[in-house]
């Protein structure tokens, strides 16, 4: 049975030796020959140094080594690649992850240096004589379906990254395995592989600096962090294939190290101003009337709602690119969208990759174009998800973009479709409910009631919705009711591999690598890549195609796309929500380390968790705390699942109060957020940051994953436990100011207990040395907000100075015709304003300047004074 699922092409074209063996003796490693060194590069041949061990496949006899010094001081990057001599082994396609160019470094002058031992081959990367990476811990193994490499680490290292996971920000250092294999992972459990693949880690060494190590490899892998029996610390890669394609990068600070990573995987995409507003969604809104009622209720409660979302409920029998004709009929949907747009609000729906294989145009179009995944016998590959039996788009197919554009243009037409403003893509790991080998998806769908039965049809809305069209009112009102292994140099994978049951078993929480996903023996169209190698790319390729389709609809507008599955570099296309979390306090807490890791270390800065939790029933207290914490994510969305307690912010008085207060702060800060986010899209400098990014020599910050910096200026210290009204917040050796009172807090590198924190309140402190431009007040929509004047909050540092910046543009255009970039400096009691003042600053004024930590003197009659603040009304034009 198994044999029929394998690729059994001969191995004649590959430089391999023997077959799988039970030999448990150490593998021989490789020896170096034919070394050629240049000013900025090194190449060499590697040949097997002895008898093959064939532990989890066949040892490859001949390899190549490439070393490139890609950049110069102070921010340096070293590229080290070990690959097969014939270049048959799969490599991540450049069409998915474009390669960074560079041989600008010079080996004699580089702080990063590569050295090697000839036999058995090992290599070391050093930074100014400090060892960063040392593979002498074990011999290199490079087999047809297994790669192994181990590096020594310093004692008790501070390691971060290797996402996606819900473990601590600082990774455990003993008996810890990070499995990277994207999967549908409801409840986002700890110690488990989740939705995304980010094989990059950061090693922070305090005063000596920070460096990162990125392995550009999309195969499934286990990365182990542990100690040997004699206590030596190591990190070990165990991958199911691909090549060792390493990038070592460093900066003078942790922040600059993250910036260097952005040069490798790509800068994040800039988002529209409105995308930073509040978003509301739920799986289980029964019809368009209920969606409209939620919009109305937010307005009635005085809680600003920027964007309304609809989950899979809007579809006809859960089929993508369809509408339920009775519960979400097109005329009503168009009225809903028109209403939102007239009120300066936005609308987003969800699209899954899986297309129903039963009676729908998207399926017929895809079959006609041949763009769905196929079995090796040419038949369509089928799985089972929400609509029942499904097929899956092949993102490698040369015509896939044309197909995706066409479906988007028709269904989301502004003229006669659902005119969405953004997009949510889900289930794109890809998810498959059917257990491998899923021999009969049709029967599985029947046995599991897929698609599920929809709710009963309501002929009209049961309650009046003032301001909505007549068709949204109760019936009593005036209304009308209604392919195989590659050749030499192809880089698509060796022939003859077992693509569904590899000898080495990664610790995939779902079991078999084909379980609950697309079968890994599928061969993609085009170049002939195997799903075995490209599985972790599926979601990111959908992201890229979806961005293309949204730009095809509106070429001049930045598309907001939020995805579940990601790979390294996904931030250049999309934002990410953290998946199907639970309404639990531990998941509220762990979301902090998740958003910080994605934004600062993985360069996916548009990120947030489902506020109040997706699965299970939230509580009033948890939701109130989460409404406040979520206001300090970059992506701020309330979302929960069908059958759970309704958790829109207006459902409880305390939650509504918490949300109003938090959104007021967020909206005042929105241009500060927008400015810092824009900077990350230009330079890679992170917006959301762990504490050690700003205090890299303070060891007390290294493992702190319950506080974070919102930009450089704002420290967020949420209450962490149920029933508590206090939090032990750490303050580094610096000056901070209470956001609410302006009171100075002199940090001394110790924790301070903040007490009497109301459930509607979140502790915030402004870091000294910063100037924050804020809007004079909040607003119900971001469009209204943009008409508000500015105030400047000046928080003098220990030296009495402060600085800040403000970026302004039209908020939406992909290419800007006029921008303003303004710098503020405060020294010796004087404020200077400099910069480029484009037309985006027209009509924008600063109406007041607030200096924190100051008290008025009798001669300062022009200032309004509180105990710890001085505010000077004024008018500064930013034109």
Curated annotation (Swiss-Prot):
Key words, A-Z: Carbohydrate metabolism, Cell wall biogenesis/degradation, Glycoprotein, Glycosidase, Hydrolase, Polysaccharide degradation, Secreted, Signal
GO molecular function, one term: beta-glucosidase activity
Superkingdom of source: Eukaryota
InterPro entries: Gal_mutarotase_sf_dom (IPR011013), Glyco_hydro_31_AS (IPR030458), Glyco_hydro_31_C (IPR048395), Glyco_hydro_31_N_dom (IPR025887), Glyco_hydro_31_TIM (IPR000322), Glyco_hydro_b (IPR013780), Glycoside_hydrolase_SF (IPR017853)
Catalytic activity: Hydrolysis of terminal, non-reducing (1->4)-linked alpha-D-glucose residues with release of alpha-D-glucose; Hydrolysis of terminal, non-reducing beta-D-glucosyl residues with release of beta-D-glucose
List of glycosylated residues: 22, 175, 297, 377, 515, 581, 617, 787
GO cellular component: extracellular region
Biased composition (Pro residues): 451-467
Localisation per UniProt entry: Secreted
Primary subcellular site in the record, as a coarse category: secreted
UniProt region (Disordered), positions on chain: 446-494
PROSITE patterns xref list: GLYCOSYL_HYDROL_F31_1
Record's keyword annotation contains Glycoprotein: yes
Enzyme kind, highest EC tier: hydrolase
Biological process (GO), any one: cell wall organization
Active site: 426 (nucleophile), 429, 580 (proton donor)
Gene3D superfamilies associated with the record: Glycosidases, glycosyl hydrolase (family 31), Golgi alpha-mannosidase II
Pfam families, A to Z: Gal_mutarotas_2 (PF13802), Glyco_hydro_31_2nd (PF01055), Glyco_hydro_31_3rd (PF21365)
Signal peptide range: 1-14
EC number: 3.2.1.20, 3.2.1.21
Family (UniProt): Belongs to the glycosyl hydrolase 31 family.
Function: Glucosidase involved in the degradation of cellulosic biomass. Has both alpha- and beta-glucosidase activity.
Name under which the protein is recorded: Probable alpha/beta-glucosidase agdC
Organism in which the protein naturally occurs: Aspergillus terreus (strain NIH 2624 / FGSC A1156)
């Amino acid at each position: 049975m198994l044999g029929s699922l394998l690729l059994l092409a001969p191995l004649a074209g590959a430089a391999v030796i023997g077959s799988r063996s039970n030999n448990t003796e150490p593998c021989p490693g490789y020896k170096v020959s034919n070394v050629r060194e240049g000013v900025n590069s090194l190449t060499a041949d590697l040949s097997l140094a002895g008898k093959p061990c064939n532990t989890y496949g066949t040892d490859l006899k001949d390899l190549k080594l490439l070393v490139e010094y890609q950049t110069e001081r102070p921010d340096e990057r070293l590229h080290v690649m070990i690959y097969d001599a014939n270049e048959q082994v799969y490599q991540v396609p450049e069409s998915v992850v474009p390669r960074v160019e560079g041989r600008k470094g010079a080996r004699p002058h580089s702080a990063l240096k590569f050295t090697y031992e000839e036999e058995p081959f090992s290599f070391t990367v050093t930074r100014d004589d400090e060892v960063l990476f040392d593979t002498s811990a074990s011999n290199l193994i490079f087999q047809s379906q297994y790669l192994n490499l181990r590096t020594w680490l310093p004692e008790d290292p501070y390691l971060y990254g290797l996402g996606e996971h819900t473990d601590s920000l600082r990774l455990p250092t003993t008996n810890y395995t990070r499995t990277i294999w994207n999967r549908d992972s409801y409840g986002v459990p700890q110690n488990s592989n989740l939705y995304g693949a980010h094989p990059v880690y950061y090693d922070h060494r305090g005063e000596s600096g920070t460096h990162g190590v990125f392995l550009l490899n999309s195969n499934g892998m286990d990365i182990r962090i542990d100690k040997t029996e004699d206590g030596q610390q190591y990190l070990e890669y165990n991958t199911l294939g691909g090549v060792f394609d390493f990038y070592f990068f460093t900066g003078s600070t942790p922040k600059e190290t993250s910036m260097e990573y952005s040069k490798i995987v790509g800068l994040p995409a800039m988002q529209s101003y409105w995308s930073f507003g509040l978003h509301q969604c739920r799986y289980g809104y029964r019809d368009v009337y209920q969606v409209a009622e939620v919009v109305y209720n937010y307005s009635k409660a005085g809680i600003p709602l920027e964007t309304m979302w609809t989950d899979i409920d809007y579809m006809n029998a859960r089929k993508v690119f369809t509408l339920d004709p009775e519960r979400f009929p097109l005329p009503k949907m168009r009225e809903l969208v028109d209403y939102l747009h007239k009120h300066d609000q936005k609308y987003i729906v969800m699209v899954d990759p899986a297309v129903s294989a039963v009676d729908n145009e998207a399926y017929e179009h895809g079959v006609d174009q041949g763009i769905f995944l196929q079995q090796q016998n040419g038949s369509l590959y089928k799985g089972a998800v929400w609509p029942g039996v499904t097929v899956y788009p092949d993102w490698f197919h040369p015509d896939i973009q044309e197909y995706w554009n066409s479906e988007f243009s028709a269904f989301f037409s502004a003229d006669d479709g659902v005119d969405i403003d953004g997009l949510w893509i889900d289930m794109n790991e890809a998810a498959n409910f059917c257990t491998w080998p899923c021999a009969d998806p049709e029967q599985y769908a029947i046995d599991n009631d897929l698609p599920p039965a929809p709710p009963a049809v309501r002929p009209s809305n049961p309650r009046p919705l003032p301001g909505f069209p007549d068709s949204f009112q109760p019936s009593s009102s005036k209304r009308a009711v209604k392919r195989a292994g590659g050749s030499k140099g192809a880089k698509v994978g060796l022939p003859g591999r077992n693509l569904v049951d590899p000898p080495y078993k990664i610790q995939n929480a779902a079991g078999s690598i084909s379980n609950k996903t697309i079968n890994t023996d599928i061969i993609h169209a085009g170049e002939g890549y195997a799903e075995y190698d490209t599985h972790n790319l599926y979601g990111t390729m959908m992201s890229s195609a979806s961005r293309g389709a949204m730009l095809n609809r509106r070429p001049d507008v930045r598309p907001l796309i939020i995805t579940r599955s990601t790979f390294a570099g996904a931030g250049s296309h999309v934002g990410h929500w953290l998946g199907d979390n639970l309404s639990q306090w531990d998941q509220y807490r762990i979301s902090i380390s998740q958003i910080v890791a994605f934004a600062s270390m993985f360069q996916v800065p548009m990120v947030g968790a489902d506020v109040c939790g997706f699965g299970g029933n939230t509580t009033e207290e948890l939701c109130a705390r989460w409404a406040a914490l979520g206001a300090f994510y970059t992506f701020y969305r309330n979302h929960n699942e069908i059958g759970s307690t309704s958790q829109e912010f207006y459902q409880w008085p305390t939650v509504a109060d918490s949300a109003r207060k938090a959104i007021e702060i967020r909206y005042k800060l929105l241009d500060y957020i927008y400015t810092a986010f824009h900077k990350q899209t230009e330079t890679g400098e992170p917006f959301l940051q762990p504490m050690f990014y700003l205090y890299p020599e303070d060891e007390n910050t290294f493992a702190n994953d319950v506080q974070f910096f919102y930009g450089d200026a704002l420290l967020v210290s949420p209450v962490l436990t149920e029933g508590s009204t206090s939090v032990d917040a750490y303050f580094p050796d610096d000056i901070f100011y209470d956001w609410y009172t302006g009171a100075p807090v002199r940090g001394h590198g110790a924790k301070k207990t903040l007490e009497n924190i109301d459930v509607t309140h979140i502790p915030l402190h402004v870091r000294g040395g910063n100037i924050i431009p804020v809007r004079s007040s909040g607003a119900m929509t971001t469009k209204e907000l943009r008409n508000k004047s500015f105030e400047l909050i000046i928080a003098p540092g220990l030296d009495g100075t402060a600085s800040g910046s403000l970026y302004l543009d039209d908020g939406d255009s992909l290419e800007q015709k006029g921008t303003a970039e303004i710098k503020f400096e405060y020294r010796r009691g004087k404020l200077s304003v400099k910069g480029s003042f484009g037309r985006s600053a027209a009509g924008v004024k600063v109406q007041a300047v607030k200096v924190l930590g100051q008290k008025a003197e009798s001669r300062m009659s022009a200032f309004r004074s509180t105990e710890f603040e001085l505010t000077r009304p004024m008018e500064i034009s930013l034109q």
